[in-house]
Regions:
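Recognition helix of helix-turn-helix/homeodomain-like DNA-binding domains
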Residues: 27-41
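Short, charged recognition helix plus adjacent turn
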Residues: 10, 48, 56-74
């Protein structure tokens, strides 16, 4: 699970504009993502919102590959 959490944190850091959009639109903030008591759940929910599956994160699949997939695969 920790690998999953760190992978999501790294992906969010790479996509700072996505994090900013989430902060404005859904009340997710940096404290919740990185230090909050439900950090893992919030990060998992954020990854799901971004269209990144747990399998892709754990496997280390390139995020651009995930986002460029045909939506019919999901």
């Amino acid at each position: 699970m920790m690998r999953f959490v760190y992978r999501v944190q790294n992906l969010l850091a790479e996509r700072g504009e996505v994090l900013n959009d989430l902060q404005r639109g859904s009340g997710v903030n940096r404290t919740t993502l990185y230090r909050g008591p439900q950090r893992k759940q919030t990060i998992a929910a954020t990854a799901y919102y971004l269209g990144i599956s747990a399998e892709d994160l754990v496997a280390g699949t390139d995020v651009e590959e995930v986002w460029n997939r045909d939506t019919s695969e999901y």
